[in-house]
Amino acid sequence: MAPRGNQMLGNAHFRKHWHKRIKTWFDQPARKLRRRQNRQAKAVEIAPRPVAGLLRSVVRCPQKRYNTKTRLGRGFSLQELKAAGISQAQARTIGIAVDVRRTNKTAEGLKANADRLKEYKAKLILFPKKASAPKKGDSSAEELKVAAQLRGDVLPLSHTITFDEPRQVTDAERKVEIFRLLRKERADKKYRGKREKRAREAAEENK
């Protein structure tokens, strides 16, 4: 059984002829070359679209341990597309990843991703389906001439940390017991349904 986790490796008591059971691979340099050739072929095939693929949303990692970090997610939610003024059908045609399962839980996250979509749309060069008959929203002929395939990430995620200026702690902040407050908020969320049901039953009995 293969070792799992950061544990001590067991002593291997080999009894069979183990030399001929060793797994070997000698195609690593060739695989590296093949991966590079496939990347280059794909870039030519999808040109002039970006090499990195679709635009992804910025999300926070789950769990209390990691939720201070941001990373690229699967796609944008329908609420974010609506806030940016882009339809779901249009988003799929202009290189935006859509994840219909995602729901926004904070106004800050919704605004950040909506702004990301607006920035992408402002920088986007949209080729017409028919060069002879461009439609509304397509880029101008001058923009099409300078268009080049993007080699790097699409709107790369910048991990910049902004520090607040030092200030005095206010009396109102001193009065808040944050640990107790968070426990209360979690309990209210957990038992909201049961408490509402209990209140309804009590109201019906009093009638």
Swiss-Prot record:
GO terms for biological process: translation. Disulfide bonds: none annotated. Coiled coil: none annotated. Gene3D superfamilies: 1.20.5.110. Keywords: Cytoplasm, Ribonucleoprotein, Ribosomal protein. Pfam families: Ribosomal_L13e. InterPro entries: Ribosomal_eL13 (IPR001380), Ribosomal_eL13_CS (IPR018256). One of its GO terms (molecular function) is structural constituent of ribosome. Its main location: cytoplasm. One of its GO terms (cellular component) is cytosolic large ribosomal subunit. It is found in: Cytoplasm. Component of the 60S large ribosomal subunit (LSU). Component of the ribosome, a large ribonucleoprotein complex responsible for the synthesis of proteins in the cell. The small ribosomal subunit (SSU) binds messenger RNAs (mRNAs) and translates the encoded message by selecting cognate aminoacyl-transfer RNA (tRNA) molecules. The large subunit (LSU) contains the ribosomal catalytic site termed the peptidyl transferase center (PTC), which catalyzes the formation of peptide bonds, thereby polymerizing the amino acids delivered by tRNAs into a polypeptide chain. Belongs to the eukaryotic ribosomal protein eL13 family. This is Large ribosomal subunit protein eL13. It comes from Caenorhabditis elegans. The gene is rpl-13.
